[in-house]
Design a protein with these regions (language model features):
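Cytosolic-side transmembrane-helix boundaries in multi-pass membrane proteins
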Residues: 1-22, 204, 208-211, 285-334
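Hydrophobic core segments of alpha-helical transmembrane domains in multi-pass membrane transport
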Residues: 17-29, 58, 101, 130, ...
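Single transmembrane alpha-helix segments in multi-pass membrane proteins
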Residues: 23-89, 114-120, 254-265, 301
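Inter-helical junctions in multi-pass inner-membrane proteins, predominant
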Residues: 33-43, 140, 183, 189, ...
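Alpha-helical transmembrane segments within multi-pass membrane transporters and channels
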Residues: 90-130, 273-274
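Helix-loop-helix "hairpin" substructures at the membrane interface of multi-pass membrane proteins
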Residues: 91-98, 107-111, 161-238
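Transmembrane helix-bundle core of multi-pass membrane transporters
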Residues: 118, 122-185, 212-215, 234-243, ...
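Transmembrane alpha-helical segments in multi-pass inner-membrane proteins
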Residues: 224, 234-297
Length: 334
């Protein structure tokens, strides 16, 4: 009986986000008549596709024990740059998409290069670059909304396939499946876990730490670039405030999904559930007419709770390791 309780406890502990998501789905399903309709589910996924895709890149960074706070303003900067290239310069959509992804990759590589060369945590570097991109966004956009994006660009955010499935949802699901495979089943994925779990042990095992950091930065850049394409494609316009705060919403979902603050732990499947939990809560608060400022308070409480739970889990694991070491030493003495 105790073993069964222990197994259930481990199952819940390892899949907190999925259990929370199940509770939320049941709750909203009971009180909302059309919640389980195919159309509503597709709308929920398409509206939050940009958060889900951003979470893939940010998860890789956090898995390797990094933290990037510049994501929101990188998104807004790339959004207005992409819109300017489309509307003012008149470049084809395909060219602009490639340029946006390449520039975003370059930005993330620059952040990582500064972190390595200045021997600073990525968190500290991105606090500085976040401010730079904040100013750059307002300068480039002149604090104006850029409209009239071509239909070929809006395809990624607004169009449907098979009659009723948004392109953004299909793309999101494919990317999650592919990157989950990369993280869980490939040598590169194992190196990401090793880098976050114990960088010194990873170095002694022959892993090139700096090369891995650059690779992870490039992955984040690709997904943030794709993310911006979907976001402005869905909105049909770009504004200097778009994307701001995305990193905190995504990090809340990532922590809730089981990714540890110190890296080396977690799965993208849990992150997927964590982001959907935040999306459902936000949607529910909006439907209930809760003031946006109260929504910020709730999100902050959830983020704090998710971090607190992560710290509790880390402390418990550390204590268990210490206990096992002590038991092993006592066994040797005996």
């Amino acid at each position: 009986m105790n073993k069964r309780k222990l197994d259930i406890g481990k199952l819940i502990s390892a899949n907190v986000a999925w259990f929370v998501l199940l509770i939320l789905v049941l709750f909203f399903g009971i009180f909302s008549e059309n919640f389980f309709s195919f159309r509503n589910i597709m709308n929920l996924l398409s509206q939050n596709a940009y958060l889900l895709i951003a979470s893939i890149g940010i998860t890789f960074v956090m898995m390797s024990s990094g933290m990037d706070l510049s994501v929101g303003y990188v998104m807004s900067t790339m959004g207005v740059i992409g819109a300017k290239l489309l509307v003012d310069v008149g470049l084809p959509s395909a060219v602009v998409i490639v340029l946006m992804i390449l520039i975003t990759v370059a930005i993330e590589l620059l952040n990582t290069w500064l972190s390595i060369k200045l021997r600073l945590q990525l968190l500290v570097v991105t606090i500085a670059t976040m401010t730079i991109f904040q100013g750059a966004t307002y300068i480039i956009s002149e604090s104006k909304t850029i409209n009239n994006l071509p239909d070929s660009f809006k395809f990624w955010g607004q169009k449907y396939l098979f009659g009723s499935v948004p392109v953004s949802v299909i793309l999101t699901l494919i990317l999650f499946l592919v990157m989950s495979f990369v993280l869980n089943k490939t040598y590169f994925g194992r190196k990401v876990y090793a880098l976050g779990g114990n960088p010194e042990a990873a170095r002694l095992a022959g892993i090139n730490i700096n090369k891995m950091r650059y690779s992870i930065a490039a992955i984040e850049g690709v997904f943030i670039g794709i993310d911006v394409v979907l976001l402005i494609g869905r909105l049909g316009s770009a504004v200097s405030t778009m994307g701001v705060g995305t990193e905190f919403t995504v990090m809340t979902g990532i922590f809730l999904g089981g990714v540890s603050m110190r890296g080396g732990e977690g799965k993208l499947s849990g992150v997927f559930a964590g982001i959907l939990c935040i999306a459902l809560l936000t949607n529910g608060m909006q439907l209930a007419g809760i003031n946006i400022y109260y929504q910020y308070v709730v999100r902050g409480i959830i983020l704090l709770a998710a971090i607190g739970y992560d710290v509790y889990q880390m402390t418990r694991r550390d204590n268990m390791k210490k206990r096992k070491l002590e038991e092993a030493r006592e066994a040797k003495r005996a």
